[in-house]
Structure formats: structure tokens, C-alpha cells
Amino acid sequence: MQESRSKESTLSGDEDKDVHRFLDEFDDKCTCKLLKEMKETLEGLKKSHPNPTNLDEFYRLFERYLRTRHEKIVWEKIRSPKDRIVQYNEIPEPTEKSKELLRKLAILKLNGGLGTTMGCVGPKSAITIKDGKNFIDLVVKQIRYLNSKYKIDVPLILMNSFNTEGMTDKIIFRYDGIKKFSQSKFPRISSETLLPVSPSHGDKGMYPPGHGDLFYSMKNSGMLEELLEGGYEYLFVSNIDNLASTVDLKLLEYFATNELGFLMEVTDKTRADVKGGTLIEYKGALRLLEIAQVPSNKKSEFTSFKKFTIFNTNNLWINLKEMKKKLEEGFFDLDIIENKKALDDETVIQLETAIGSAIKYFPNSCGVVVPRSRFLPVKTCSDLFLVESNLFVEKNGTLQLHPSRVPETCPTVKLIGENFSKIEKYEKCFKGIPDILELEVLTVSGNVLFGKNVVLKGTVIILADEKSKICVPDGSVLEDNIIYGNLPIIDH
């Protein structure tokens, strides 16, 4: 009887093919119906959209998403890209030629992000970092120093988003010569219907689609053509919150001399970077692999140090002529990242792309393993604590490790809990940022308040019990201390 059931439930090879063919045809019909609904909805949204052609680009992205969303990377086909990875210290020192190449260079800072993870209501670039200066102020200072030193005029370009352009304009009005354009404005889609959320959400129902949008937006805004007509051939791109991403003549000359189309700066992975994208060789091409593309059963392997030892800093060098050529050929179908967000009580999807994934379209591309000193992002209040401290000194707009710091690495800082997750609460925890020149490890959790002129050395762990408070008095020196429990300060 058991054998009979088994035979009844087994399909022949032809029957199995028929089932798959039926499912594929059904899926195609559903996709076509959904695409038709999407097109009709987008036509309605065009009436109120500031740049209706953005929605045509979104439709193309959405169609590609539907066609490819079930495709998975074949883990076994991933190879080490060691033949395409160059060590920074193996690159020749720059010659006089590099100074001439500067005349063909433009600098672009990615400025589309809000500091929402840190509780900011405006662009992250507006956060004050050193001596009353924010990210934009410091970047402008960097460029002015570069231009003054070499008697040139390297332009600064900001790629804003609809979220950041208003406040950014209020910051840059006092600076001359900054070029700018805004990236696309795409509709968020419902995770249930896969159609745009209600227009009643206003701008909350829209989003900037990641920095991979740079290629389309540079072309669409006219910025690409403007740069090429101005004689610029090379573009250095980086995140505006990475104040260590300055122009490096050594990299510029290497990029130009080797006639590369795309160069990605990578650096050695630490425990703080386990989720960062990495370079791989896949199907004969150099590819950026992001954690969102990794199968769930392989994520632990991805975040380990054994197989993937480097990660993407998002400091990128791009040949503008090559970029234009690829755009004219219709390339840059970048890997799509499905980013789920909460909008009121609804789960929505943002279809995003990463600029680094364009590397696969440039056969003449490579990764360069640069020193960690070229990567100093501010993603959390723990990062902000480091750059605000005396660990870094500002020189010509760049943050550099204090010369007295030994070893020449950053301490490990973990500020844990709701008091340190948002800037407003974080700032209330410090009367002054402690001296951390001799700090190795700092972990702070709970309701902890720091007084003025505090010095932290070695390993310091401060853990406040739930519903209790620890106050570190003015002038305290903590060295290799563990403090826990409840320690209020009583004024006398």
C-alpha cells in the first residue's frame, strides 16, 4: 500500500517539466499584470513629481526587480579576486605628472543621506564635528587647501537628495563654486501589493534609491556632460561622512597611468566591519558582494575573517569618458538591494543600488588595499564620540590621529543603549568629551553621565543598572576600571 502511494506521488520527467512550465507561465502572467498596474499608477504620480522622468527609470528598475528577484548568487562559483587586488604600498610614489592630472580631476561627495539612525532630522553632513565645523565645512576646507597648494581649481560636487538639498543649500550658500545635483526620487512600494504607497504619505512615501543612482542622475542632470566639456576625465567619489577620504596623488597617478575605468579602495576587515561589502571574482568579473546578497546559510562565512578579509570603503575612482560610454551602451543594471522599512503601520520596500556594484561593467578595474587611515566614517554616536575627541586633530579639513597616540589605531568604543543611540540624548551624557589618548577599550551602557576633564585610559567598562545612574565626576581619571551599579553624585 505504501509503495502504491509512492508511485502515485512521483512525477515522470515530462510531467515535472510541464509543472515547471505551467508555474513559469503563471508567474509571467502575474508579472505582466503587475507591471501594467505599476505603469498606470506611475503615470498618475507623474503629475505631481518634480522630475517625471525619474518614474520612468523607477519602472525600469522595478521591472528588472520582478524578473530577477528569485535569482541567487551561486556560492560555489565565488572566487578570490587576488589577481585584481593591489596593495597600496606596492604602488609607485607619485611623480610630477600627478600634479598635472589634478587638472583633470573632479571630487564628488555623496550627500543624500539623513542621519536618521543617529536621530538627526536633517542631513548627516550638518552634524558639528570639530570647532563648530560640520562635514561640509571640513570638506570645503580640504578642497581649498588642495587647490591653494597646487594652484589649481579642482571642483567639489555634492550629490544631494530631496531629503538633504534644502538644508544643504543653507550651509553652502556662503561658499563659492560648489556644484550640486540631486539624485532620483522614487516611490516606496507596499510589501503586500508591490505597488506605490498612497500619495497621502507625501515625501515619506518617496525615497532616494541609494548611491548607485549616481550614474543615471549625473547624466540626467547634465553634470556628466558639464564635467567632460570642462576637460575633466577622472572622478573621485566618497561618502561625505568619511573625512579621511582625501585626494591621494599616488592613487590618482596609478589610476590614470594604468588607464583604469574603475578603482575601489578597500581596506582590511576588523570586527567593526564584518557586514561591509567585499570584492569577489564571479563568472569571470570583479564583483562587489553585499551582505544583502548572501544566502542566509552563508552569512556567518561572509562575516568571518577567513575567506573575506577586505571590505569596500566606498572611496571610488571613475573614468568619466568610460562612464559616458557605458551609459550610451545602456549598461549599469546594478545589483538591486531590497531594503524593507516601516512606514506608519505598513512594511514598505525600497529598491536600491550601490555604486560599487558598477565595477563589474569595467573590465579594466581593480581594488586597492589602502591603509585604515583612509576610512573614518561616522555611522553611530560611538563613531561621533571618537572624531569629537582629542584622539583626532583637524588639519586642513582632514582628521588625523593625534601624534601622541600610541599605537596608531583607534580604540574600540561601544556606547550602548537608548542614551547613546540618538544625538540629542548622547550630547546630554557629556559635559565634555573625555581625554582618550591612552584608551584601548571603552564600553558604556545605561544612564551614565560624564563630567568635565575626564581622562580614560586602558580598558574602561561602565555599566549602570536598570533605573539607576552613574555619574563620572569632573576631573576623574579612570584607568583599567570596571564600574557598575549605581553611583550618583551629590552636590555639596
Swiss-Prot record:
Nucleotidyltransferase keyword on record: yes
Sequence positions that bind UTP: L110, N111, G112, G113, K124, Q183, G210, D241, K379
UniProt-listed Enzyme Commission number(s): 2.7.7.9
Function: Plays a central role as a glucosyl donor in cellular metabolic pathways.
Disulfide bonds: none
Source superkingdom: Eukaryota
Entry keywords, A to Z: Magnesium, Metal-binding, Nucleotidyltransferase, Transferase
Binding site for substrate: G112, G113, H211, N239, I240, D241
Amino acids binding Mg(2+): K124, D241
Xref: Pfam families: UDPGP
Protein name: UTP--glucose-1-phosphate uridylyltransferase
Known catalytic reactions: alpha-D-glucose 1-phosphate + UTP + H(+) = UDP-alpha-D-glucose + diphosphate
